[in-house]
């Protein structure tokens, strides 16, 4: 899973550079290279999950903001966390964002179909995982956690 995350992040870094957007993608994975973060999954579908989550975080971010991507483990799961510094969620909306065509997007952040996070949720569930959204504690922004069963 780590390799997939790093590849998708690198693609997004290049896209941001090409678009002259100054949004920093931070991974806390360098000190974890020796870890074996293995899951059973369909690689291109997991890439799609990560890409959809990063695309969403980037679309809510402004220049000079950071998006953090981390990977940790529990006894049974790998936990991927993506945190942004955007506006976060209204109190009633964190889990609604995974519904088809739902948008929590203020008009200043542009139009989206409302399908990306629903697709991500469906793919995660196909892999016997779970996905959850929340506001960051004591900070501005949103946090998405993806749990996937490890081997």
Predicted segments, located by residue:
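Short conserved segment of the HATPase_c
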Residues: 89-101
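Short alpha-helical Gxxx[C/S/T] motif in the catalytic ATP-binding
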Residues: 116, 120
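Short conserved segments within the C-terminal catalytic ATPase subdomain
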Residues: 15-30
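Conserved glycine-rich
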Residues: 129-130
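A conserved beta-strand-to-alpha-helix junction within the catalytic ATP-binding
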Residues: 1-13, 29
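Short helix-loop "hinge" at the ATP-lid/N-box region of the Bergerat-fold HATPase_c
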Residues: 57-58
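Conserved micro-motifs of the catalytic ATP-binding
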Residues: 34-41
């Amino acid at each position: 899973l780590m390799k997939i995350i790093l590849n998708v992040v690198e693609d997004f870094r290049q896209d941001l550079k090409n678009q002259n957007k100054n949004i920093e993608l931070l991974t806390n994975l360098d000190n974890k290279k020796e870890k074996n973060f293995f899951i059973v999954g369909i690689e291109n579908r997991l890439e799609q999950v990560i890409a959809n989550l990063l695309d969403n975080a980037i679309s809510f971010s402004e220049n000079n903001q950071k998006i953090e991507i981390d990977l940790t483990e529990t006894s049974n799961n790998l936990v991927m966390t993506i945190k942004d510094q955007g506006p976060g969620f209204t109190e009633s909306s964190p889990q609604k964002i995974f519904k088809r065509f739902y948008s929590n997007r203020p008009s200043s952040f542009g139009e989206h179909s409302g399908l990306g996070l629903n697709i991500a949720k469906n793919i995660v569930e196909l892999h016997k995982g779970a996905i959850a959204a929340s506001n960051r504690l004591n900070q501005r922004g949103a946090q998405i956690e993806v749990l996937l069963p490890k081997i």
